[in-house]
Amino acid sequence: MTADRLRLSVVIPVKDDATALAVCLGALAAQSEHIFEVIVVDNGSVDDSADVARRYGATVITEGSPGIAAAAGAGYDSARGEVVGRLDADSVPSTDWAARVLEYFHRHPTTSAVTGGALFVDGPRALRRVGARLYLGAYFVLVAGALGHTPLFGSNFAMRASAWRSVSAEVHRRDGLIHDDMDLSFHLGPHGIRYSADLHVGISSRPLSGGGMRLRLRRGLRSIVLHWPAQLPWLRVWARIRQAG
């Protein structure tokens, strides 16, 4: 498959988030000429998330094991494209998101994964941009410190299918108390993760709610502890230097 014929599969794990999912899928439908398939992974929804996905022409698969890691992994396994994009149900991709994902991989043939940032689409309007920048700025700085390289942001990233296949047996997909994007970042790191300011999505500010933030912090800590001390950041950096040399 030549670079100019890369196919993009978009994976969206969901549980009981039909309203947000409809907005996400509507945004993807407007750029469908750049998307080979959309895969929605239903992780035990009791609302009409699956029906919403089918109305927008998405492929729906069911993952019975609870947790985003299990659902996302099932979606990646099912993807048929050479590039696998990942959005959350509350992600609202920009009108050129899919085209920019494909363009990035065309231009960077040795990069295995690329991630971008986000802006909040709800909450106080005056705080949407600054709040998202503070939240994501802290995420990228702190998690990069734990990893020794750029982390993936689960609401907005894409990777080569070949990169996923190389680590799919290693990730902790059955652990419901981790951040799947952080876990995947630990395993994909040696293969090359890059940040692109050109990949834009909107997201909900729900992670900043009291309960949501506490849960994210717990998951983040567990995601790191699972990989330390064997993958302390300076050891990972040194391993990459030796590999490059």
Regions found by a protein language model. Give the residues of each.
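N-proximal low-complexity "stem/linker" segments adjacent to membrane-targeting elements
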Residues: M1-A27
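Short, acidic, metal-binding catalytic loop of nucleotide-sugar glycosyltransferases
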Residues: G26-I35
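A conserved acidic beta->alpha catalytic loop
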Residues: D42-A50, S91
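Glycine-rich, basic loop-to-helix element that forms the pyrophosphate-binding segment
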Residues: E63-A79
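Short, flexible, basic/aromatic active-site loop/helix in glycosyltransferases
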Residues: G116-V121, R129-T150
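Acidic donor-binding loop at a coil-to-helix junction in glycosyltransferase catalytic cores
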Residues: D175-L184
